[in-house]
Every structure is written in C-alpha cells, then in structure tokens.
Amino acid sequence: MKNNWLTLKSLFLCVSALSASGLILSGCTENANLNVGEWSLEYDAHANGIDISKGSKLIYDNVYAAYKLADSVVSTRDYAKHHVSTKKINDHFGEGYHYEVTYTGNNLPVLVQSFYVYPTKDYVLTDFTLESTSEMASNYMAPVNVDRMPEVLNQGENNRALFIPFDNDCWIRYQSHPLTFTELTSYEVTAIFNNDDREAMVIGSVEHDSWKTGITIGKGNIYNVGSCLLYTSD
C-alpha cells in the first residue's frame, strides 16, 4: 500500500459486566490515565505502551503498535516523542472517549495510536494511522502487540484458544485448542476462554479494506497464553 495516510482498526473485547460512571482524567509528561466506567487506560512513557485494565484486573500490558517500513519493522517503541490527548466522542458505537497518543521523531512517519472507550460497552476499540509528507509504503500493520499477556482467565486446565481458518482454506476446520501450543494463528478473530466458567477474551478486526487479518498467540502455559499479536498484511 502506497499513500501518505494508512489506517487500521481492530477490536478488543473482554466479556464481563460493565458499570457506567463518569470520567477521571489525569496527565503529565511521563504518563496519562483515562478511567471510564470500569475501564482504565494508562500510558507508560518508558515502554511507549498502553496498559488496559478492567476493574482491578490488568487485561493488556504495554500494548504497542508496529508496522513495516521498507525492510524494517518499526514500533511505537522506536519513537522519541509522544503526546497524549483525550476527547469526548459520540459515534455509531455510542457515547465515549477517544484516547490518542501521537508519536513523532527519529525521522519516522507520524504515528497516531487511538483507543475508543465506551462506559456502557464491554470492549475497547483501537486503530492507528501513519502520516507523512512524502510517499511511503507498507504491507504490514499491527495495532495490537503484547509481549507478555497478563493472567486474565481463572486458572484451570480447561483454558483454551479458538482457531478460525483463513477464508480461502477449505480443508481446515474451526477448532479450540488447549493452551499447550507453541504458536497459534487465527483468521480475523480469536477467543481465549475458560471452558468451565465460559469467561473469555475476544480479539479481532472490526474493519479493513483488502488485507487479511491474523491473530498470533505465543506460548504461555496451560493456564494462560504468552504473547499476543494482531496484524494485517497483504
């Protein structure tokens, strides 16, 4: 894809009850926090990532965005400067807040990472854009990168991950796997769930134009997955 503007949107979803409440916002040079209902987002300036919590539970630890530029993979961790802002929104998902981190510096395209939080919804949306005054090309964008997933599910030997085959593969079936795999890649969406209490975390794409979306889950243990990567590529 060649353009001076690239965008991708993907979906976070954690299945549990939400309670509506007001907004608490604080910010400084090193971090900025957003609290909406039971959702909390915190920017970590040292890791250039976002912590996402629901209630007292950390759901995603240091979420960062990445993309391919020429032959290199660039992430938000490679940028020298950042700016955090928050504003109210009212879109077709409802009333909520737009939490935005703009990364600049090191002669890289401007990267704008956005999170959309709704106090009455049980999910968080995220996308990121790349902006440049000169032509650029990329065939890989990954809005969700987590090197080590927190333990979200209750411990149990029946924790599993859902595999969905790519749409042009007629020979592989939908299947849920115990968390004993080394790596698992699902198409468009996956669910990491406890098959006893049925609590789950769902991650997948909301919209894109012509590329395919994959969710790659790295090795953890029988109770929890390791890493998590959501990407789209040609």
Task: For each feature predicted by the language model, list its residue ranges.
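Bacterial N-terminal signal peptides that target proteins for export
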Residues: K2-C14
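Acidic-aromatic substrate-binding/catalytic surfaces of carbohydrate-active enzymes
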Residues: A32-V101, G105, S114
